[in-house]
Amino acid sequence: MTVQEHLQQARHNEGLAQRLGIPPFRTYDWAITVLFYCILHFVDASLLDHHNIIPGGHTATWKRGQRIPGRNDYVRQHLPQIARAYQMLYTASRRARYEGAYLGPNGAGYYQRLRDNEFASARQFFRQWGW
């Protein structure tokens, strides 16, 4: 994807996450996952635009005995300002997808806290760039 395509996808995901978190949907597990993928696309746009990096996945891999950094590594290295928020969104997204987290009555609260804190913090960082 190009930088512009990543930005377009990020904005699309941002709007979708808002809709998933309100009635009649209230699918907080998916809303949390989409919040994460919104920030992921801003991250990928940034890595491509500023460092010419296209991550191969979330986590590091090994190829011929050499460690290949993953997106999570690149965030810590190149975007330390949002690393904590990104990691929390990443973890929450994984829990939502693979552990069925956020399906119960507390799902709304978890979604709102992630949206209003970690997501808002990371999103504000990219808004400073006009994104």
Report residues per predicted region.
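Terminal alpha-helical segments
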Residues: 1-131
